[in-house]
Curated annotation (Swiss-Prot):
Subunit structure: Part of the 50S ribosomal subunit. Forms a cluster with proteins L14 and L24e.
Gene Ontology molecular-function annotations: rRNA binding; structural constituent of ribosome
Domain of life: Archaea
Keyword Lipid metabolism applies: no
Keywords associated with the record: Ribonucleoprotein, Ribosomal protein, RNA-binding, rRNA-binding
Gene (name only): rpl3
Recorded family membership: Belongs to the universal ribosomal protein uL3 family.
Name of the molecule in the record: Large ribosomal subunit protein uL3
Length: 342
């Protein structure tokens, strides 16, 4: 196509092919497919789950030495995550299946005493024989390659008035030894884990959540296709593509078409934790967060935005691709936090 016809030769395609198919997520609870290998010198959970409450703005001292505003106060938008402690109701051992190379569960241990609210999502046994389950762990621990904690959220401690918990698997990492991971998992059985036991303020995390659902949308909003001129030769439409493809093949899946927009699982890498607190009253507006409520207990402040609507479950994970020039690991100096939600 020549320049005389008014088109750029190198115009990129509309919309990314890297996020196909653009359909609704299978579950509102994020499914994490990749976990990093981290060496911290001590065992720890590699992730945490929290509820998105809203956004605020905070005055923070810029601590990046390469920034022209280094040492000065800057205003940053922050997302508030309501982070009640996670309940550890069990753990699993995984080995590699020799036939296909996938991980396969070989042993599972449950906590001896389980809270009643787990009955909403689990069929609880009358009695848990921990000794019998631990014998199976001892039998298979030599071939185990992964240890994962079975955790349940505690939404009744959050501000959303919900009772049914979400169940997740979070790997235990930080040390290469499987024995140390198993001992750590046993020590957590029947206990709760707070966000301060997993992350520290100043570090980077990956944020995984299901985005806001927009329903069925056209190509203008869904792909950013250019609106056609509104004159008589475009009488067949303006908010549409000029062509949906050639005569053959009959359907070009790469062509922008109307369809589902939003409610997709997305991952945003290397978000910085500004602050982790224990008292949600410190950051909750007087009238509560709009469409959420009151943050009662532990909370996490994330710099910038986070996918999803208010009340949505967000999974935080140790970064799988940390930048070569990471920001300072020290806790940022927060001067002031607004009391008015965005």
């Amino acid at each position: 196509m020549s320049r005389a016809m008014g088109l750029k030769i190198n115009r990129p395609r509309r919309g990314s092919m890297g996020v196909y198919p653009r359909k609704r997520a299978a579950d509102i609870v994020p499914r994490v497919r990749t976990w990093p290998e981290v060496n911290l010198g001590k065992p720890t959970l590699l992730g945490f789950a929290a509820y998105k409450a809203g956004m605020l703005h905070a005055v923070v001292v810029e601590d990046r030495p390469t920034s022209p505003l280094y040492g000065k106060e800057v205003v940053k938008a922050v997302t508030v995550l309501d982070a009640p402690p996670l309940f550890i109701w069990g753990f699993r051992l995984y080995t590699l299946d020799p036939t296909n190379g996938y991980k396969r569960s070989i042993a599972e241990v449950w906590a001896p005493e389980l809270p009643a609210y787990l009955r909403r999502v689990l069929t609880l046994p009358e009695k848990v024989d921990v000794d019998k389950q631990m014998k199976k762990v001892e039998e298979f621990k030599d071939v185990a390659v992964d240890v994962r904690a079975l955790v349940a959220t505690q939404p009744h401690l959050s501000g959303i008035g919900k009772k049914t918990p979400e169940l997740l698997e979070i790997p235990i990492g930080g040390v290469p030894s499987v024995d140390e991971r198993i001992k750590f998992a046993v020590s957590l059985l029947g206990k709760t884990v707070s966000p301060k036991e997993v992350f520290t303020a100043g570090q980077l995390v990956d944020v995984i959540a299901v985005t806001k659902g927009k329903g069925y949308q056209g190509v203008i909003k869904r792909f950013g296709v250019t609106i056609l001129p509104r004159w008589h030769k475009h009488r067949k439409g303006h908010r549409r593509t000029g062509t949906i493809g050639p005569q053959a093949p009959a359907v070009m899946f790469t062509q922008p078409r109307p369809g589902q927009m939003g409610f997709h699982q997305r991952t945003e890498y290397n978000k910085r934790i500004i602050k982790i607190g224990d008292n949600g009253a410190e950051i909750t507006p007087k009238s509560g967060f709009l469409h959420y409520g009151v943050v009662k207990g532990p909370y996490i402040l994330i710099q910038g935005t986070v996918p999803g609507a208010r009340k949505r479950l967000v999974v935080l994970r140790y970064p799988v691709r940390p930048p070569k020039k990471a920001p300072p690991a020290a806790e940022p100096q927060v001067v002031w936090i607004s009391s008015q939600s965005i």
